[in-house]
Amino acid sequence: VLVLSHLHSGDTPSAASNKAQLESFRQVSAAFEGIESSLSASAGIFLGPEYHFDLTRPGIALYGGEAVNGMKPLRPVATAEARIVQIREAAVGGTVSYGATHQLERASRLAIASVGYADGYLRSLSGSGIPLRTGGIAGGFGFIAGHHVPVVGRITMDLTIFDVTDVPDGAVRSGDYIELFGSNMPVDEVARAAGTIGYEMLTSLG
């Protein structure tokens, strides 16, 4: 048995509702003497000890994600990678992926990775060809051989194409793994590129 509640605006430390909920929860939990109580998930933990009560419920904090937007007190520990199944040389003027939405402005080297939206790698991370994209969202990146490499064209059901032209020759080969998020690309930064939050990224992949 547990007296339980949840802060609806815990990820906004300045929200007056946090203090109001805290006081209400104190009154409720006091009415259940001898029963443990819990108010805070990850975001509430960072509001201070008064929000902790008998136990806390860390979720995204366990993965080193941002429980509070812009606050990065933890080291990211979750990593997602995809295997490169093919490297292709492509000529200037060629097009990439469905709809030919991305046209190459230079001779390019493209890495095709075995991950797509069926695996939870969000289609909104596509480099181009997403009609709903606004100016604030530029598309996704991968990380390999010390380089951030952009997604080009639309992410498909099972495959994603990365432009590895700027990675030195021989540094990327079929069979290598490309980081989708991890220590070099925090999940929350990738999520922002997709127009969403780290929670969705972590719960979608699989």
What residue spans do the PLM features occupy?
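Active-site loop/helix belt of alpha/beta enzymes
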Residues: 1-92, 168
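C-terminal accessory subdomain/extension
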Residues: 91-206
